Swiss-Prot record:
PANTHER family: PHOSPHOGLUCOMUTASE (ALPHA-D-GLUCOSE-1,6-BISPHOSPHATE-DEPENDENT) (PTHR42946:SF1), PHOSPHOHEXOSE MUTASE (PTHR42946). It catalyses: alpha-D-glucosamine 1-phosphate = D-glucosamine 6-phosphate. Belongs to the phosphohexose mutase family. This is Phosphoglucosamine mutase. InterPro entries: A-D-PHexomutase_a/b/a-I, A-D-PHexomutase_a/b/a-I/II/III, A-D-PHexomutase_a/b/a-II, A-D-PHexomutase_a/b/a-III, A-D-PHexomutase_C, A-D-PHexomutase_C_sf, Alpha-D-phosphohexomutase_SF, GlmM_bact. Binds 1 Mg(2+) ion per subunit.
Length: 444
């Protein structure tokens, strides 16, 4: 049975359009509360949010719904998604909730949940909540209505947690670091983490106004960080997204490092420290050069479906620690239960510090294969899997590339698009092959 409201990362959509409306979120809060009351005598739920103006409205509706079901609520105000996961676990709470649409612009918002262990919840739990949404409400007796209070020291608690993932024997003294918080949830915590570890911090994307989240700044618009690093003569730049669960880095030369490269650095550092790394998990989109480089070092590499949720599932099933996506969602499960942009940046900077080499030097010999990605718009009702011309072209190109490249064709999960990606050692060849596939997809 498919889910009606939940997607791959909670519930998300345009504000004012179902399901991101105050009335639905009230019902959602009540439904979640009823589910929790089935397993907890007096549940306590932590609610965090990013800096979107709609967060105030949705927070109030969610709080009211939970209270109406007899659930107590703790409010953190703007706080990164991974901070909510951490605090839910650290404070032994029943559930953590984040109101955020991550890297999207302010017009969108969403709601996602973490278990008492700070982990994303199962499909079965989400189905149970959806059933409760459709059922008639069961209001609590007046004496059993939940209470709400603010957790005023939430930012400070999270800053200390982030710092604890960085070696006590190291510091960032002598480094100038530009921190770009995307005008999002980490605007008031990310700069403090790097500053308290000794770095000279320059802030950009740290002035949210409710409307400017992810607007020309952050991990989805890294050029702003590249320019700021150069302008300030900084050693490194750190770009987070709106809820700070992903990160990209920039060095003093303006070179941008994506999640694939940062994952390799994290794995290589563990190996250099003599720590066992049996394997790492990427996605179908992870650059082939990273896979080859890791295998040459004796590290098994497995590809999951696109999405940090699937990377996490694969890591847990195999008992591994490190994984990630090119977008900057990185997982180090011995440090945190979920992807954390700040913690991931610290792991990379720690590798740079204790190896005495720049990030570029740590990536020496790992040259990313050129990738060409084309989005092909599909006609209504068009089934790309029945396109014989596309199938023949895909086989032909696969034979041409051999072990020096690969082809990936997959549908978008949100739009009527077919994503065609070709990876090859030669950029011109990747482009030519991708164009051939796109034409076949459109005309087949």
């Amino acid at each position: 049975m498919s889910r009606k409201y939940f997607g791959t990362d909670g519930i998300r959509g345009e504000v004012g359009t179902s399901p991101i409306t105050p009335d639905f979120v009230l019902r959602l809060g009540h439904a979640v509360g009823r589910v929790l009351r089935g397993t907890h005598d007096r549940p306590v739920v932590l609610i965090g949010k990013d800096t979107r103006i709609s967060g105030y409205m949705l927070e109030s509706a969610l709080e009211a719904g939970l209270n109406s079901a007899g659930v107590d609520v703790m409010l953190t105000g703007p706080l990164p998604t991974p901070a909510v996961a951490y605090l839910t676990r650290a404070l032994r709470l029943s559930l953590g909730v984040v109101i955020s649409a991550s890297h999207n612009h302010f017009m969108d918002n969403g709601i996602k949940f973490f278990s008492a262990r700070g982990e994303k919840l199962s499909d079965a739990w989400e189905m149970e909540v959806e059933a409760a949404i459709e059922a008639p409400p069961q209001w609590s007796d007046s004496s059993q209505i939940g209470r709400a209070r603010r957790l005023h020291d939430a930012p400070g608690r999270y800053v200390e947690f982030c710092k604890s993932t960085f070696s006590n024997e190291l510091s960032l003294k002598g480094l100038k670091i530009v921190v770009d918080a995307a005008n999002g949830a980490a605007y008031h915590v990310a700069p403090d983490v790097f500053h308290e570890l000794g770095a000279d911090v320059v802030r950009i994307g740290c002035e949210p106004d409710g409307l400017n989240i992810n607007d020309g700044v952050g991990a989805t618009s890294p050029q702003a960080l590249v320019e700021a690093v150069r302008m300030n003569g900084a050693d490194y730049g750190v770009a987070l997204d709106g809820d700070a669960d992903r990160v990209l880095l920039v060095d003093r030369n303006g070179r941008l490092y994506n999640g694939d490269e940062l994952l390799y650095v994290m794995v290589a550092d563990r190996l250099a420290q003599g720590e066992p790394v049996p394997g790492a998990v990427g996605t179908l989109m992870t650059n082939m050069a990273v896979e080859v480089a890791l295998q040459q070092r004796g590290v098994e590499f497995v590809r999951a479906k696109v999405g940090d949720r699937y990377v996490l599932e694969e890591l847990v099933s195999r008992g591994w620690q490190l994984g990630g996506e090119g977008s900057g969602h990185l997982l180090a499960l011995d440090k945190h239960t979920t992807g954390d942009g700040i913690v991931s940046a610290l792991q990379v900077l720690q590798a740079q510090q204790r190896n005495g080499r720049s990030i570029a030097e740590l990536l020496d010999g790992v040259e990313l294969f050129p990738q060409t990605l084309i989005n092909v718009r599909l006609a209504a009702g068009q089934d790309w899997k029945l396109n014989d011309r596309l199938a023949r072209e895909r086989i032909a190109i696969g034979n041409e590339l051999g072990q020096s490249g690969r082809v990936l064709i997959r549908p978008s999960g949100t739009e009527p698009l077919l994503r065609v990606m070709v990876e090859a050692r030669d950029a011109a060849q990747a482009r030519l092959c991708a164009d051939r596939l796109a034409v076949a997809a459109q005309e087949g």
